[in-house]
A protein has these predicted regions:
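Aromatic- and Gly/Pro-enriched helix-to-coil junctions and flexible linker segments
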Residues: 21-123
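Sec-dependent bacterial lipoprotein signal peptides
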Residues: 1-21
Length: 123
């Protein structure tokens, strides 16, 4: 009985103290939560989106099935100028949803919108 009297408070102490040693690191929980909408440029933001989500093997590359070779800026700009790029990435009802394997993140769509609104420059 004496052993239980000593072990029970000790067990309660450890049970309450150990969870206090755990902490959440916001950067680890939400690694890509920052969305830069101030410094949106083709070379800094847009080209990365295009390369990873559009100009992929078989899609918007030379010989791909997509309309235009987006590894060539002028062909990407043509899709911007004819008004097809934004409705597709926004997945609007009348447009062909792009990319076909899943929507862009909201941040990526916003960056594309800002870049187009600023004239879709090759900067």
């Amino acid at each position: 009985m004496r052993t239980t009297a000593y072990l029970l408070p000790l067990a309660v102490l450890f049970a309450t103290a150990l969870p206090g040693c755990y902490y959440d690191n916001e950067e680890e929980l939400y690694p890509n939560s920052f969305c830069d909408t101030v410094n949106v440029t083709y070379s800094g933001s847009i080209s990365k989106i295009i390369e990873s989500k559009c100009a992929t093997p078989g899609c918007h590359v030379a010989g791909g099935t997509g309309t235009g070779n987006f590894t060539v800026f002028s062909e990407l700009k043509e899709q911007v100028d004819n008004g097809r790029l934004l409705p597709s990435v926004r997945r609007e009802a009348e447009a062909v949803p792009m990319p076909p394997d899943g929507a862009l993140r909201a941040c990526e769509v916003r960056q594309l919108e800002l870049w187009v609104a600023a004239g879709a420059l090759d900067n």
